[in-house]
Amino acid sequence: MAKFLLLLRSENTEKENRFYIQAIQRFGGEVVFISDTDSYDDVLHALDSVSGVLLPGGYNVGRLDYFLIDYVVSHQLKLLGICQGMQSMALWGSSHQLISIGNSSHHQEEGYVHSVILENSRLQDILGVHSFYVNSYHYQKVLDSYYFRVVGKSSDGVVEAIEDSNHSFQIGVQWHPERMLEY
């Protein structure tokens, strides 16, 4: 059974964290938890036992986000960034900042909101489609990504997916796939 490290953000509710936990377990994974208040030594110890990291959604780039991305990239672990986690991946190593979207079309509490169009990518290979509808909970966006390649955008040009083209699974998505399991 593969072990995946899940960063528990202190601003996330128990319900929000439960979605991530259930998704990992549903697909046969075991969850190793760290908190965004844990020491760097504790985080390094936890990273020794996992094959991948899930960077979840949240409201701000946390103090451990870039530390985890540094470790994952240098040790070639699997990485899935969701919502804020993807934004952290996109901003990693750059001086770029998050931009306010300015409308509510990307923040709806339920259902599928807009489509995402994928370029030639691993994510497209995994999903087996070029375009599909996603949920959307974000108020901010990134314009580009410094290290990871942009592979998906919404019809209005918002970056929705990024990946490391040189690694089999280092992917960030702006939507919440863990919540799509209930639709």
Question: Model features per residue range: what roles?
Answer:
Residues 94-98:
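A glycine-rich, often tryptophan-bearing local segment used as a flexible ligand/cofactor-contacting loop or short
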